[in-house]
């Protein structure tokens, strides 16, 4: 290297030093320049000598949770013919996403008794509950019966008893199952639930108040109204539950049903009459309106010219006039108008 280059030597003998810069992480995903392109650029004059085979390089896998793909190594090996027969069989088995292995048995999965002998473990342990304490106490009492007191403390539940409890009408006191206090729950519990949507109310009695079966009818004789659970849930969802409760149980009086003014003239009744649709008018107002149309002034139903005397309203008016003569009038009237004479 220290020798000087003669002018006859070519520039190909000059040695150049290349320093590779450390690549940044950002450039890891960039496409690398294939080596064959550099070789082809150096020997551009000898491009006609032969064909070059370009094989794509395997890219470096970058961990990115947003990019997911299937395994493709087997496909690449098959494409280049580098896959052996053993690897082909392994890839065939791995190509299936889910593989189930049959047990070759017709029995259901799980316990053979389908959980009928499962132990209920939410209560106190069987060896520590009240029934176990009572049974141990009974056993100790049997051992100590007929013996003298040995002055040995055996616990608060194991004091020596000199009188044996007798059976009563409530049951056997020594069995422990009829005593006061907690009773041992069954260990093996299987619940059978039946949803009964039938109200079991006698339909004939509810609609008509009469049933041909009488007291022998097995259904309930009740004429009150009930709502099923799904009806209450629907009202809760729609926001209508309990809105009209006061109106449903409100008892209306007769005075509220009978008006105190004529619907046509808006004045106090003069010879009141009532139609078939239970609307009250003055006799003159009803006849005058009938000349225009035979329909009711309030509900627009056909009256057919039938106007009956309003006996109930006349009795109310007489009652209020009598009360007014005594100094107490509860009938609402205009103060400027005189009492209506009933003819």
UniProtKB/Swiss-Prot annotation:
SUPFAM superfamilies: CCCH zinc finger, RING/U-box. It catalyses: S-ubiquitinyl-[E2 ubiquitin-conjugating enzyme]-L-cysteine + [acceptor protein]-L-lysine = [E2 ubiquitin-conjugating enzyme]-L-cysteine + N(6)-ubiquitinyl-[acceptor protein]-L-lysine. Residues 23-95, 323-343 are annotated as: Disordered. One of its GO terms (cellular component) is U2-type spliceosomal complex. The modification N-acetylalanine is found at residue 2. Residues 50-61 are annotated as: Important for interaction with CXCR4. The keyword Acetylation applies. It comes from the Eukaryota. Residues 23-34 have a biased composition (Basic residues). CDD domains: RING-HC_RNF113A_B. A zinc finger (RING-type) spans 262-300. It holds the Pfam family zf-CCCH. The modification Phosphoserine is found at residues 6, 84-85, 253. Residues 333-343 have a biased composition (Acidic residues). One of its GO terms (biological process) is DNA repair. Residues 39-50 have a biased composition (Low complexity). It is found in: Nucleus; Nucleus speckle. A zinc finger (C3H1-type) spans 196-224. Component of pre-catalytic and catalytic spliceosome complexes. Interacts (via N-terminus) with the spliceosome subunit SNRNP200/BRR2. Component of the minor spliceosome. Within this complex, interacts with SCNM1 and CRIPT. Required for pre-mRNA splicing as component of the spliceosome. As a component of the minor spliceosome, involved in the splicing of U12-type introns in pre-mRNAs. E3 ubiquitin-protein ligase that catalyzes the transfer of ubiquitin onto target proteins. Catalyzes polyubiquitination of SNRNP200/BRR2 with non-canonical 'Lys-63'-linked polyubiquitin chains. Plays a role in DNA repair via its role in the synthesis of 'Lys-63'-linked polyubiquitin chains that recruit ALKBH3 and the ASCC complex to sites of DNA damage by alkylating agents. This is E3 ubiquitin-protein ligase RNF113A.
């Amino acid at each position: 290297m220290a020798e000087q280059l003669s002018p006859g030597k070519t520039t190909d003998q000059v040695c150049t030093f290349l320093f590779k810069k450390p690549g940044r992480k950002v450039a890891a995903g960039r496409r690398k320049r294939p080596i064959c392109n550099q070789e082809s650029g150096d020997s551009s004059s000898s491009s006609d000598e032969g064909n070059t085979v370009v094989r794509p390089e395997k890219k470096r896998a970058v961990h990115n949770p947003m990019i997911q793909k299937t395994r493709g190594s087997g496909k690449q090996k098959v494409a280049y013919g580098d896959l052996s027969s053993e690897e082909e069989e392994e890839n065939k088995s791995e190509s299936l996403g889910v593989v189930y292995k049959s047990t070759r048995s017709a029995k259901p999965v799980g316990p053979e008794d389908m959980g009928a002998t499962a132990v209920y473990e939410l209560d106190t342990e069987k060896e520590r509950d009240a029934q176990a304490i009572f049974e141990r106490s009974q056993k100790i009492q049997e051992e100590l019966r007929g013996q003298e007191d040995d002055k040995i403390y055996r616990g608060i539940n194991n004091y020596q008893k000199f009188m044996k409890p007798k059976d009563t009408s409530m049951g056997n006191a020594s069995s422990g199952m009829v005593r006061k206090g907690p009773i041992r729950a069954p260990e093996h519990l299987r619940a059978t639930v039946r949803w009964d949507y039938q109200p079991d109310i006698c339909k004939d009695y509810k609609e008509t108040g009469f049933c041909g079966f009488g007291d022998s009818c097995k259904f309930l004789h009740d004429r009150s109204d009930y709502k099923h659970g799904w009806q209450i849930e629907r009202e809760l969802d729609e926001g209508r539950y309990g809105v009209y409760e006061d109106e449903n149980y409100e008892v209306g009086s007769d005075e509220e049903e009978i008006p105190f003014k004529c619907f046509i003239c808006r004045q106090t009744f003069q010879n009141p009459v009532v139609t078939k649709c239970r609307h009250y008018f003055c006799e003159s107002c009803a006849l005058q309106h009938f000349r225009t149309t035979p329909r009711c002034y309030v509900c627009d139903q056909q009256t057919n010219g039938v106007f009956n005397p309003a006996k109930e309203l006349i009795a109310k008016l007489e009652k209020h006039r009598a009360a007014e003569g005594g100094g107490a009038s509860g009938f609402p009237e205009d103060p400027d108008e005189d009492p209506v004479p009933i003819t």
